[in-house]
Amino acid sequence: MQQWCASVADLVDDTLVRRLASPSDLRSGREIAATGGVEFVKRGPLRVVARVKGGQTRTVELLSGASGLEWSCSCLGSRKHSFCKHCVAAALETRWRSPSRRIA
């Protein structure tokens, strides 16, 4: 039986991002996203890969898995399993640019 997974854009709501990120990473990630620091490499419903500026350019991958959102970033902060500023920026841009989230 095939299991249904929500899209990455559906998973990265404000509540989840606030819960996963530290206050400083949340602030920095919002600033990076607001200033155009996110460039999508691949953007599909279940997998997003982005290059994110923030000091140095890092690569972020967001995945929709059976247990919810999975993520990785090439920065040192993410290696500690934290939702770093780069992940925040990529998540916010994914949500903001999702066709189902646009306001007409």
Task: State where each predicted segment sits.
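Long, low-complexity, compositionally biased intrinsically disordered regions
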Residues: 1-104
